[in-house]
């Protein structure tokens, strides 16, 4: 019985790139190799406009499950490779069609003749291949406009690819082509989605989390570690910086008027994150802010908070409503972790009436009454840093180390 031997990957947005496309292709190939480490028999060949993954006996479903989370892949097809002879092509098309799952009633044939010396023209091949499928199936008809299955045949010199099963990739650009950012990872629903969408644009992320023991628990800290771990499904690794924030928050609560405590707290977070970004050679800061969602996410608040950093602040969720954000969180696997009922530092010392239109002048005046610099230095110096990788990759590395 014929089975899938290849997966053909299409790049999508990467095809719009010019002279630097080779960098994008190389990065994507590297990311795919990392993602498929578990499958030692696989061979990958990346060309200018497509990637070919030779399965060599590996389970195509298991491989496909990992490919769907790799940014930079627009679509991919499970494919069979047959000799470029009419009878072989007909048999391959039927075999591929019969492997399609689900309620299939209609199909069409699409032929692309890369090898122009093939003895039959496209219009001659269509009825030959389609007729063979009709003769060997029941209750199946041709529908060229809206078929359940499109049987794609690519004819080349010496061999042809037969494809039916087309699957969507994650889209976007390969992680690593767009530099690095620091993402503020609070533990809520929004910030992991912001990290995901940032990675989708080809940007590597490192996460910064502020925790305030004993006001925040170890379980709240573990929740953030689990979120960062979940995000590794979409990249090679996530470096997480856990910043002790208790003394900063206690001082803000004592020295700053309550209406401005939230604004000043966010400004301190930005200052600390900028310091870490400088250490880690990051180029921007990403947050999970959505315009108007809470008091610290009004335009006035963002204007005042942005003052303390020279780094670009990326806000992927800025125009989304909560339901849109939740939908993405559910799709990427972070929602159930985010809703664990453990408080983060943003809920500590929450003012009754936070300013929704804070002014820079007032924030600067309040901060000038106390020197926060030593507290910022201490928070940066005492941060805990951990590197998280996909669980399967870590297990493979530990298994390898046990051999020595």
From Swiss-Prot:
One of its GO terms (cellular component) is cytosol. The keyword Nucleotide-binding applies. GO terms for biological process: thiamine biosynthetic process; thiamine diphosphate biosynthetic process; thiazole biosynthetic process; tRNA 4-thiouridine biosynthesis. Pfam families: ThiI, ThiI_fer, THUMP. Gene3D superfamilies: 3.30.2130.30, HUPs. Disulfide bonds: none annotated. It is found in: Cytoplasm. Pathway: Cofactor biosynthesis; thiamine diphosphate biosynthesis. It catalyses: [ThiI sulfur-carrier protein]-S-sulfanyl-L-cysteine + a uridine in tRNA + 2 reduced [2Fe-2S]-[ferredoxin] + ATP + H(+) = [ThiI sulfur-carrier protein]-L-cysteine + a 4-thiouridine in tRNA + 2 oxidized [2Fe-2S]-[ferredoxin] + AMP + diphosphate; [ThiS sulfur-carrier protein]-C-terminal Gly-Gly-AMP + S-sulfanyl-L-cysteinyl-[cysteine desulfurase] + AH2 = [ThiS sulfur-carrier protein]-C-terminal-Gly-aminoethanethioate + L-cysteinyl-[cysteine desulfurase] + A + AMP + 2 H(+). Its main location: cytoplasm. Keywords: ATP-binding, Cytoplasm, Nucleotide-binding, RNA-binding, Thiamine biosynthesis, Transferase, tRNA-binding. ATP binds at residues 184-185, 209-210, 266, 288, 297. Residues 61-166 form the THUMP domain. It comes from the Bacteria. Its EC number is 2.8.1.4. Catalyzes the ATP-dependent transfer of a sulfur to tRNA to produce 4-thiouridine in position 8 of tRNAs, which functions as a near-UV photosensor. Also catalyzes the transfer of sulfur to the sulfur carrier protein ThiS, forming ThiS-thiocarboxylate. This is a step in the synthesis of thiazole, in the thiamine biosynthesis pathway. The sulfur is donated as persulfide by IscS. Belongs to the ThiI family. This is Probable tRNA sulfurtransferase.
């Amino acid at each position: 019985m014929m089975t899938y031997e290849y997966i053909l990957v299409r790049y999508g947005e990467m095809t719009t790139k010019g002279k630097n496309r080779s960098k994008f292709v190389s990065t994507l190939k590297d990311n795919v190799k990392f993602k498929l480490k578990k499958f030692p028999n696989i061979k990958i060949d990346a060309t200018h406009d497509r990637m070919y993954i030779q399965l060599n006996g590996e389970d195509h479903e298991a491989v496909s499950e990992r490919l769907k989370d790799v940014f930079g892949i627009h679509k991919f097809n499970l494919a069979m490779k047959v000799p470029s002879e009419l009878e072989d092509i007909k048999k391959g098309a039927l075999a591929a069609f019969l492997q399609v799952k689900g309620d299939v009633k209609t199909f069409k044939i699409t032929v692309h003749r890369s090898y122009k010396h093939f003895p039959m023209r496209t219009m001659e091949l269509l009825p030959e291949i389609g007729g063979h499928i009709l003769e060997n199936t029941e209750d199946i008809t041709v529908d060229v406009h809206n078929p359940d299955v499109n049987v794609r045949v690519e004819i080349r010199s010496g061999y042809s690819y037969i494809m039916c099963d087309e699957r969507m990739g994650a889209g976007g650009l390969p992680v690593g082509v767009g530099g690095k950012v620091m993402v503020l990872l609070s533990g809520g629903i929004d910030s992991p989605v912001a990290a995901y969408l940032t990675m989708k644009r080809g940007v590597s992320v490192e996460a910064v989390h502020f925790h305030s023991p004993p006001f925040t628990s170890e379980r709240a800290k573990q929740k953030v570690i689990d979120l960062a771990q979940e995000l590794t499904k979409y990249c090679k690794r996530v470096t997480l910086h856990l910043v002790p924030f208790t003394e900063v928050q206690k001082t803000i609560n004592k020295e700053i008027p309550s209406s401005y405590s939230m604004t000043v707290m966010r400004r301190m977070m930005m200052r600390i994150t900028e310091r870490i970004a400088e250490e880690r050679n990051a180029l921007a800061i990403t947050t999970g802010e959505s315009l108007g969602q809470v008091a610290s996410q009004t335009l006035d608040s963002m204007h005042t908070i942005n003052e303390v950093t020279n780094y670009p602040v990326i806000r992927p969720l800025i125009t989304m409503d909560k339901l849109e954000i939740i939908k993405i969180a559910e799709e990427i696997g972070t929602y159930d972790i985010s809703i664990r009922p453990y408080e983060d530092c943003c809920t500590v010392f929450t003012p009754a009436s936070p300013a929704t239109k804070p002014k820079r002048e007032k924030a600067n005046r309040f901060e000038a009454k106390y020197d926060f610099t030593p507290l910022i230095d201490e928070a940066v110096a005492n941060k805990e840093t951990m590197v998280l990788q996909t669980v399967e990759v870590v297990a493979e590395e530990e298994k390898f180390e046990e051999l020595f």
